[in-house]
Amino acid sequence: MMGLMPVRAAAGVPGRNLQGEKGETVICRGVEAHTSGPMLQVGQVAPDFHAVNAKMEEVSLSDFKGKKVILNIFPSLDTPTCALSVRQFNARAAGLENTVVLCISMDLPFAQSRFCSTEGLDNVIPLSVFRSRDFVAHYGLQLADGPLEGLMARAV
């Protein structure tokens, strides 16, 4: 399920990923924007990636091998919709067995930690990809244009 809904195949001059593949068109704050590459589709294997946790430690998707993993990807905790999604995932994650919910954004780990602490969120794992371009390259989610250019499109 995508938070920013793809409306059609990318047209015009959308972004391109490192392999030169065209991105997808999404609606961001009522304006068309393009992702840096094609988004993963249901059934595709999620590529491994590196991110930073609240302790400034590098983590990878493979660190959670053997567990079910839900990726909640969003532009920033400083947007109401993204903050709400993290709160809702936290509430639902409490009842999930052998499952981790990774809330991934380009927010700095300090901001993510402060948000989760202030909100009392302890059932999700906030991860920052602020220095990890492999994530945005492999997942095709970086916004190549539009009002939030440079951040990531929302995706689950």
Ranges and model annotations:
Residues M2-V156:
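Chalcogenol-based redox active-site neighborhoods
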